[in-house]
Swiss-Prot record:
It is found in: Cytoplasm. S-adenosyl-L-methionine binds at residues 73, 104, 123-128. The gene is rlmH. Its EC number is 2.1.1.177. It comes from Aliivibrio salmonicida (strain LFI1238). It catalyses: pseudouridine(1915) in 23S rRNA + S-adenosyl-L-methionine = N(3)-methylpseudouridine(1915) in 23S rRNA + S-adenosyl-L-homocysteine + H(+). GO terms for molecular function: rRNA (pseudouridine-N3-)-methyltransferase activity. SUPFAM superfamilies: alpha/beta knot (SSF75217). This is Ribosomal RNA large subunit methyltransferase H.
């Protein structure tokens, strides 16, 4: 099973790239973590936010390979603790499909992305900066994998 993060935004600070790479390289060959960056729409004083969300959503959904399970990262989604995320990984593995996790831009996800999703996950009730979310997601998914693999990374 492949895990795919599809995130709005490019040109992240170096610490984000390094943090993401540190965790993504740790994944086993049979469960690689891939990041696909979607160019954010131009936001200005008179920007049409609904149109920007629509365009970003179209680009995100176009990046999802056919047949993948789509999971959105959204504040109103279901909160999972680390053990619950590990359980989700096991469920996803049994489903025998790759998983695409959608991370929206500053205004969130388009209605089309939310409709296409089979699951919605709330990483936190806090609003987190999008660069930080990439690193937290990579670490959280790695930690969940470590639980399923009985790897000593996670300690209770």
């Amino acid at each position: 099973m492949k895990l795919q993060l599809i995130a709005v935004g490019t040109k992240m600070p170096k610490w984000v790239e390094e943090g993401y790479k540190e965790y993504s390289r740790r994944f086993p060959k049979d469960m690689p973590l891939e990041l696909i960056e979607i160019t954010a729409g131009k936001r200005g004083k008179n920007a049409d936010i609904a149109r920007i969300l629509q365009k970003e959503g179209e680009a995100m959904l176009a990046a999802v390979p056919k047949g993948n399970r789509i999971v959105t990262l959204d504040i109103p989604g279901k909160p999972w603790n680390t053990e619950q995320l590990a359980e989700q990984l096991e469920v996803w593995k049994l489903d025998a499909r790759d998983v695409s996790i959608l991370i929206g831009g500053p205004e969130g996800l388009s209605p089309a992305c939310k409709t296409a999703a089979e699951q919605s996950w709330s990483l936190s009730p806090l609003t987190l900066p999008h660069p930080l979310v990439r690193v937290v997601m990579a670490e959280s998914l790695y930690r969940a994998w470590s639980i399923t693999a009985n790897h000593p990374y996670h300690r209770e």
